[in-house]
Every structure is written in structure tokens, then in C-alpha cells.
């Protein structure tokens, strides 16, 4: 692998560790999306959000103080 190729790759655990406390979007396999402040994430992709919102079809359907998402349901996590 060339040096240029290795610079383009990001270790997901470093990325996820770097966005703790940031506003994130978590999409689940069933299409439901949660938005909130990332409090913690573990090696199984279990996620805890604070000030969470449930979003279905681009509409906020519920507000939560804390949201806990099981990792096997998570499709992706992105920083807002």
C-alpha cells in the first residue's frame, strides 16, 4: 500500500472517539433516524445520545432526554 493510499484511510474508532460530545445522526436498518449529542459508543456500536430526537420521513416524531441504541440495529453514524 502506498503512502497516499494509507493517508486516505481513517480508522473508524478514531473517528467515532473524536466526535464524542458532537451532534450526530444515527440511521437504523429499519429506516428510523435518531439525532442527538453523542455521549458514548462501544465496540459493538451500542450508542448513547443525549437530547435525542426520533426522525421518520424527515419529520421529528418524538423528543427524548436520553436515547440508547443497540449496535446491531445501527446502519451508520454521521456527524451533523
Curated annotation (Swiss-Prot):
Give the Sm domain ranges. Answer: 11-80
**A GO cellular component annotation in the UniProt record:** nucleolus
Return the SUPFAM superfamilies for the record: Sm-like ribonucleoproteins
The family database entries (InterPro entries) matched by this protein are listed as: Lsm6/sSmF, LSM_dom_sf, Sm, Sm_dom_euk/arc
The regions listed as transmembrane in this protein's record are none
Q: What GO biological process terms does the UniProt entry carry, in alphabetical order?
A: maturation of SSU-rRNA; mRNA splicing, via spliceosome; tRNA processing
Any Pfam family the entry gives:
LSM
The entry's localization annotation reads: Cytoplasm; Nucleus
GO MF terms on file? RNA binding
Q: Which keywords does UniProt give here?
A: Cytoplasm, mRNA processing, mRNA splicing, Nucleus, Ribonucleoprotein, RNA-binding, rRNA processing, Spliceosome, tRNA processing
Q: Which PROSITE patterns does the entry link to? A: SM
The family database entries (SMART domains) matched by this protein are listed as:
Sm
Family per UniProt? Belongs to the snRNP Sm proteins family. SmF/LSm6 subfamily.
Note the subunit structure. Answer: Component of the heptameric LSM1-LSM7 complex, which consists of LSM1, LSM2, LSM3, LSM4, LSM5, LSM6 and LSM7. Component of the heptameric LSM2-LSM8 complex, which consists of LSM2, LSM3, LSM4, LSM5, LSM6, LSM7 and LSM8. The LSm subunits form a seven-membered ring structure with a doughnut shape.
Q: What does this protein do?
A: Component of LSm protein complexes, which are involved in RNA processing and may function in a chaperone-like manner, facilitating the efficient association of RNA processing factors with their substrates. Component of the cytoplasmic LSM1-LSM7 complex, which is thought to be involved in mRNA degradation by activating the decapping step in the 5'-to-3' mRNA decay pathway. Component of the nuclear LSM2-LSM8 complex, which is involved in splicing of nuclear mRNAs.
In Swiss-Prot or TrEMBL terms, this protein is called U6 snRNA-associated Sm-like protein LSm6
Protein source organism: Lodderomyces elongisporus (strain ATCC 11503 / CBS 2605 / JCM 1781 / NBRC 1676 / NRRL YB-4239) (Yeast)
Amino acid at each position: 500500500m502506498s503512502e497516499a493510499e494509507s493517508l486516505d484511510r481513517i480508522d473508524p474508532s478514531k473517528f467515532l472517539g473524536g466526535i464524542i460530545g458532537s451532534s450526530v445522526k444515527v440511521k437504523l436498518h429499519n429506516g428510523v433516524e435518531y439525532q442527538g449529542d453523542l455521549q458514548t459508543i462501544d465496540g459493538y456500536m451500542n450508542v448513547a445520545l443525549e437530547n435525542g430526537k426520533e426522525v421518520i420521513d424527515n419529520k421529528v416524531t418524538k423528543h427524548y432526554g436520553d436515547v440508547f441504541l443497540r449496535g446491531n440495529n445501527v446502519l451508520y453514524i454521521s456527524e451533523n
